[in-house]
Amino acid sequence: ASDVYKRQGRKYDFIAANINRNILTMDMPAYAEALDTGGDLLMSGFLEEDVPVIEARARACGLDPIEVRMRDGWAMVHVKKA
């Protein structure tokens, strides 16, 4: 489990997570809970083909995808908590 679980009750303006797709999708509800309204979450460490899965999970957690970048087969997704 990620360190975000150890910080229950605190809210953050920005979280960066460079982990694989499976961990990101598993921990995304905790990231969403830890983000303050209007906060940003940058996720990387996964493949381009995983972007639709990451975006769908983000939306399900109340996070709005606002930017995707890809390079050499790797991806980064930036989401914002509404």
Regions from the language model: what does each represent?
Residues 13-25, 45:
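A short SAM/SAH-binding and catalytic strip from SAM-dependent methyltransferases
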Residues 38-51:
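ADP-ribose/adenylate-binding Rossmann-like module
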Residues 6-14:
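A short acidic, Gly/Pro-enriched loop at the edge of an enzyme's catalytic core
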Residues 25-40:
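A short glycine-rich, Lys/Arg-flanked "PGG" loop and its adjoining helix->strand segment in the class I
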Residues 1-5:
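Short, small-residue-biased leader/transition segments that mark boundaries at the very start
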